[in-house]
């Protein structure tokens, strides 16, 4: 898995959208945003003990599969547009890439997009309340296992949702410390120039 800050171009969403020069984002930075990641053996997902361990520890007791491509997904154009609309969920979004590749974009505390490139074997968890979106890359294909705790619910809440209790929890748990540091830094700069 690789991640980087996106440029502001409105070009094809399937392009990498690197800044110039590229600004890569570490796994540690993603973890600060609540993003979890594992690299697993996608060819043996049915019997992989590591996947079973993760599922048991995190309570992922339901799975289904999705293939995202113009040929495989009914109402492809409508669905890919919906996936790319900035939104949040009240539950984690858990995806295990079994084949192909695609991008999950997530907002950082300063509201900048971070693009996360997932490929075969990558399992990613986006935290509940995080603003994010998904698109295929230029390969135009992804097969993923979707995991859920309990009954599968995939209800997107399009931005803005800042008053939603789950969004507030996400801000308090993952963004508040960073935002407080920015406020202190700005206050210090303002005091120094006054």
Swiss-Prot record:
**EC assignment:** 1.13.11.54, 1.13.11.53
> Could you tell me what the cofactor note in this record states?
Binds either 1 Fe or Ni cation per monomer. Iron-binding promotes an acireductone dioxygenase reaction producing 2-keto-4-methylthiobutyrate, while nickel-binding promotes an acireductone dioxygenase reaction producing 3-(methylsulfanyl)propanoate.
Q: Which domain of life is it from?
A: Eukaryota
Q: Per its UniProt record, what Gene3D superfamilies does this chain match?
A: Jelly Rolls (2.60.120.10)
Region annotation Disordered: where it falls in the sequence? 1-21
Q: In which pathway does it act?
A: Amino-acid biosynthesis; L-methionine biosynthesis via salvage pathway; L-methionine from S-methyl-5-thio-alpha-D-ribose 1-phosphate: step 5/6
Question: Any idea what this protein is called?
Answer: Acireductone dioxygenase 1
């Amino acid at each position: 898995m690789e991640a980087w800050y996106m440029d502001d171009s409105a070009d094809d969403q399937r392009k990498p959208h690197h800044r110039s020069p590229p600004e890569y984002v570490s796994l540690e930075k993603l973890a600060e945003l609540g993003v979890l990641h594992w690299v697993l053996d996608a060819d043996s997902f049915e019997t992989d003990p590591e996947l079973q361990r993760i599922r048991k520890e995190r309570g992922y007791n339901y799975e289904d599969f999705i293939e995202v491509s113009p040929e495989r997904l009914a109402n492809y154009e409508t669905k890919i547009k919906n996936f790319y609309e900035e939104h949040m969920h009240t539950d984690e979004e858990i995806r295990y890439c079994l084949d192909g590749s695609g991008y999950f974009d997530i907002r950082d505390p300063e509201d900048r997009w971070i693009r996360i490139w997932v490929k075969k074997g990558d399992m990613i968890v986006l935290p509940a309340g995080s603003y994010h979106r998904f698109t295929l890359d230029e390969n135009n294909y992804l097969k993923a296992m979707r995991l859920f705790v309990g009954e599968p619910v995939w209800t997107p809440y399009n931005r803005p949702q800042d008053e939603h209790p789950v969004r507030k929890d996400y801000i308090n748990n993952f963004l508040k410390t960073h935002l407080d540091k920015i406020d202190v830094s700005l206050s210090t700069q303002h005091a120094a120039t006054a």
